[in-house]
Amino acid sequence: MVSQAMPMAAMTTGLADDEAAPHAAGAASGAYVAQLHTSLEAVKPLWLRLETEGVCTGHQHFAWAEGIVEGLVPQKADLAIVEVRDAATGEPRMLVPLMRRRAFHHWVIEWLSCGVCDYSAPLLADATPWTRQSAEAAWTAVLSVLPPADRIHIVGIPKEVGGVANPLALLAPARDSIHSHYGIAMDGDAETVVKRICRPSFVKALNKDLRRLDRNGGLALVEADTPALVDSIFGKLVEMRLSRFRELGRFDLLAQPPVVDFYREAAHRGLTDGSVRIFGLRAGEVMVAVQYLAAHLGTLHALLIAIDQGAVPNVSPGLCIMGELIRWGRGAGFDYFDLSVGNQSYKEHMGAVKSVLSELCYGITLKGVAASEAIKYRGRGVAFVRDNPRLFKVAQEFMQRWRRLRAPR
């Protein structure tokens, strides 16, 4: 275990809390220099430039990060946004949005996410390929300017971003996590896209369910394109989702008012910049499903879905709204539908492609090493349970009962 610890000197900056200064990355990473920023405003021009001209996901939009900082970052947490530049030319190569927070009497460096970013990926300056060597050199530069911490814990690292290798996934300490994400490419005519890209069994079930919904008073995909519709349809999403999760005995982030406010405000902002879209699927006068999406260039990210499973018997509203949104997305010019993180069976049923997410979880100090090892052991335990269906069912039922007992009445 001790061999995994990194020297604290590599993490110490000697800066005041709001000071930002460039640091050489050391002999091992002479190709890059890094600069620590402790406010969003300090990096706003560069962030917006990389967002529009570089490579990133919809989870790395500046406005998304701004909402996280304004409403979700814990009071005792510090922003640690690192700008990495080419040492020879001075040109920016990437922006790495991190934060430092207190966790059980030690400090941890995490992604600037607070639970509302499915993916952890730097904003890259361009599509220039990264190698393991260049990624390690850039990461050494990042570490050289971060504030003192006991461990690194970054989850949800996709292997690629926009077809470019994610530098974080190339690092030696990066390991496959127990989580995966799914996506499906969309091309050709919108009217036939579902039939062409999805599995025949999914298409058959989808068409059958759509006919049943249509017989229930007519079928309509409603976009929340006004402030009133955003409030109404998003409110329905929260209501249906919390009801469903209570029924399943599961916890949902939307049980926290600040998280609800974050998503609602992002949806209102999306009316102007198109970064967020909300759709409801209505059968007659009944809203049977709601989908919350983020949009970036040609990609639609499915972030939140809520369904009323009992509204129409023997129908899967979730599959129906997914099918309708694939058609809508292709018609609107999108070429990739990201089904986000989670191993739900409907994703494979559709024909989406699975990709395993990586994570960085390692200690810098002995205290951090101990905490990181505990997290890894817990992850192995979860993976073991998931790989044993009977054991998983028992564990799931136990957790559902436990959460119901703890839920307010």
Task: State what each model feature region is.
Residues L124-A127, I184-D187, D225:
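Short beta-strand-to-loop capping motifs
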Residues G30-E110, I157-H181, D189, V194-P313:
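A conserved beta-strand-loop-helix scaffold within acyl/acetyltransferase catalytic domains
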Residues E397-R409:
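Short linear elements at protein peripheries
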Residues V2-V33, K159-I197, A332-V394, R409:
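Active-site/acyl-donor-binding loops of N-acyltransferases
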Residues S113, A137-W139, R196-V203, A374-R380:
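Short intrinsically disordered coil segments
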Residues L79, R101-S177, A295-S355, Y362:
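Acyl-donor binding region in acyl/amide transferases
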Residues V69-L72, C117-P122, W130-A135, D187-V194, ...:
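Low-complexity, flexible helical/coil segments
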